[in-house]
Amino acid sequence: MTTFAGEMADERNCIKLILPLKLNWEPYYYAPADVKRGDRVSVHFSGRQYVGVVSQVRVHPQTDPSKIREIDSIETSLARVSAGELRLWAFMAEYYLCTIGEVYKAAYPYGKLSEEKAAVLIAKRREESAARRRAEEQDRLLRLQGRIDERLGRRKASLAKARKDSVKDRLTGEIKQLECELEAVKAKLSAPAPDTAKEEILDADPNPTETKLSPAQEKAYADIKTGLAGGKPVLLNGVTGSGKTEIYIKLAREALDRGKNVLYLSPGIALSSQLADRLHDAFGNDLLCFHSAQTPARKRETTAKLRSGRYVVLGTRSALFLPHHDLGLIIVDEEHDSSYKQDSPAPRYQGRDTAVMLGSIHGAGVLLGSATPSMESLYNCVTGRYRMVELRERYFCSEDAELQIINTLAERRKNGMVGNFSIKLIEEIRKTLSEGGQVAILRARRAYSPLVQCEACGDIPKCIHCNVSLSYHRISSRLICHHCGYSIPFSGSCSLCGGSLKALGAGTQKIEEEVQALFPDARVARLDADSDGRSVVKTFSDGSTDILVGTQIVTKGFDFDRLSLVAVLLADSIISQQDFRADERAVQTFEQFRGRCGRRGSRGKFVIQTSQPTHPVYTLLKGGGQEIMNGMLDERRQFGYPPFTRLVNIILRDVNEGRLVKFAGEMARKLAASLDGNVCQVVGPFAPLVDKVSDEFIRRIRIHLPKDQSLTKRKATIASLVRDFETSRSWIGHIVIDVDPL
């Protein structure tokens, strides 16, 4: 740190500063002559101290010079923000209609003055989260121990009655296996809690493995190189299991060999180490990881290494903000994934599209990859903005998993259902387990049941802060709000009349319970937001678990050798969403899940249980849906939805619903008056499906904008109107602008 109060008498260098605040202007300060653009300096602003970034030097102030303050110090211990970073921030602020200060805060969330405090807070949260996961894991292990004890008792009883030597030998072997499993469970139960402050560190590998491609991969690889050489982003449309990762690795290795850095974006690397392990095998110490689960200290270490070295950086969307230099290649894996979109706080950016802009800033090639590309990326290929490369051949198995649609209404009529499982699916699971395979079951809701209802008066317990029902979590015996976290103990009795509360619907906890009852000899695990994801994935990957029940986390890019059957329960909840993207998302979810099985030679099986077997989504899954896909695009064109238009959502919140309705209506009228009604459409205000969260009522206004030369100007008009609306009224609510909402 360099301090210099009173040292600027000879030369007054007026600078403009970016502060980590929602400011629509950049304040002026006086600084020493040697301050450069991108330097970080400490200043006082509105009675508080901040670390800002110098955006301009030697400017002519448009205000009274006597009111301009001097900076407190130059933070010489903090690295200078590069010109490339500043360009990216400016683009994001303009495109996503936020302030550059909000982008700065996202890029450097732990400024010098708050890093220590933030590190303590995050460490505390990590400890609390680890304790909760530990309790869940202990509960699961105790239940598993009970099931193994029960199976062991049955086997020993059968052995005592057995007469044939062959039967005795088989039972003896099974007993030994169960005893080994029991000892392993007991060891886990007695093991000390892991050190939450300690993070996994990949061991050095001086001999990274070489990547060998199949003929189909070689062709795709060559086509990608041709496309990247042409200066356009490339979309690799490759079926699940086709070996896209191997192509990424080869391209990344070539970039490193040219002295370039590589950014490899993945939707959720914090959950599974599978991808990190594969990339570590390929790149050894040339691999850096960056994601939200890391401590601030680890993030700073990664950032420092990147500033001075050549690396492949594996990260989530936040890795876009790293101080990239000599960037040669950006890979966006699973580019369709919704987790690339930042929901809150600002900037509410789309990581995939921001990656394309980052590539343009650095002159780097951009490769998007997916087995189920987004409509936006497919449309960009049709219009010539992107180049598409297809990879239709699976690496180990030439065929997709066999699809079976089971009509649950028909099965229920003929008594073919046991709880939430059809007898047909039960038989498929038994067959798979008997052949030594594994099973994954998707249920797109966590908890035991999404709601409970009084059998006497019909009351459904709701969150006192949100307009939603409370979900029943049987393991913790609590009713929990999945929006704000509010919870109350579950007593089983109605608070109004004292009647019995009945669980309605089924979440992953209930499905797990049903699976354990149907297959008592199977080893069952659950993967959702309430379980220890890394531990569950590891045990399933190494074969210690037979059946995995999970939410949509199980559809992500895992690679399990023995997984040969995947099944979707209650699929109607996935295909019946009220959104213009509902069918697209359903197809992506199902195809991604389908691709998890049959990845090592044998053909897998994909079973969907639904009450709507003729839904267009299932026609698409059967491979005969090009006409349906074209129809979906025609509908979007007709009603003005992406990819043919741009959407902007204005989200208004207030604790007073009446006041909110009044101001939201006024806002909508002003927007409609300010935009050309012949080409722009203002819809609303309307209440979303969940119209109250954390004691705030919500209204939305949706704006459809044509993708023409006036798009930027119209978006600026929207931003200006919202700013004026916020500052010219005595309204205590707040407004959010969401560009390209999902």
Sequence positions of predicted segments:
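Accessory, non-ATPase domains that flank or precede helicase/AAA+ motor cores in DNA-metabolism machines
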Residues: M1-V313, A319-L367, V382-S398, S674-G677, ...
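Short, ordered beta-strand-loop transition motifs
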Residues: A9, H473-R474, D691-E696
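A general secondary-structure junction signal
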Residues: Q56-R58, Y108, R443-R445, D528, ...
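Generic solvent-exposed, charged/amphipathic alpha-helical segments
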Residues: A90-A93, I426, R430, E512, ...
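Inter-lobe coupling/hinge segments of SF2-like helicase ATPases
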Residues: P208-A222, G230-V661, R700-I701, G733
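Long, largely alpha-helical accessory region at the distal end of helicase-like NTP-driven motors
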Residues: Q438, E635-I718
